[in-house]
Amino acid sequence: MKKFDEINIIPFIDIMLVLLTVVLITASFISQGKIQVNVPKASTAVAFKSDELAKLLTVTADKQLYFNDKPISQEALEAEIAQWNKDQKVTLKIDAEASFQDFVTITDMLSKNEIKNVAIVSMKDKGKSAGKNSQESTPSQSVPTTP
């Protein structure tokens, strides 16, 4: 019988490098598609189930529009909104640094098409003593828009 004096760890290292590659590739796919938006703070917020948030409209600080995390022009967004049903649920995620005019423009598009079921994403403010890590981003129900 052959006696093993030492263990060959090269196959183990090969497997670990393959697993590391898979993890890094997977992590890069997960991080893509997230739009960095600094949402405003609110003292009250009502949490939603994510399946209720069918359509997501995002405005970044540099006035970029996104529909369901994909860039879109204002004209294309208007055409898209025109195709929606009047009872369509919409979530607005607007950066705190964006101008109020950006908010008014989006809500005006929704009002023209009589879409009134609108929620606004805000960050729940846990108080002045709370740190940044203790804040949660939750969509809060807004007052329906009026035409």
From Swiss-Prot:
Residues 31-147 are periplasmic. Gene3D superfamilies: 3.30.420.270. It is a single-pass type II membrane protein. Residues 131-147 have a biased composition (Polar residues). Residues 125-147 are annotated as: Disordered. Residues 1-9 are cytoplasmic. Keywords: Cell inner membrane, Cell membrane, Membrane, Protein transport, Transmembrane, Transmembrane helix, Transport. GO terms for cellular component: plasma membrane. The keyword Protein transport applies. It is found in: Cell inner membrane. One of its GO terms (biological process) is protein transport. Belongs to the ExbD/TolR family. Involved in the TonB-dependent energy-dependent transport of various receptor-bound substrates. This is Biopolymer transport protein ExbD.
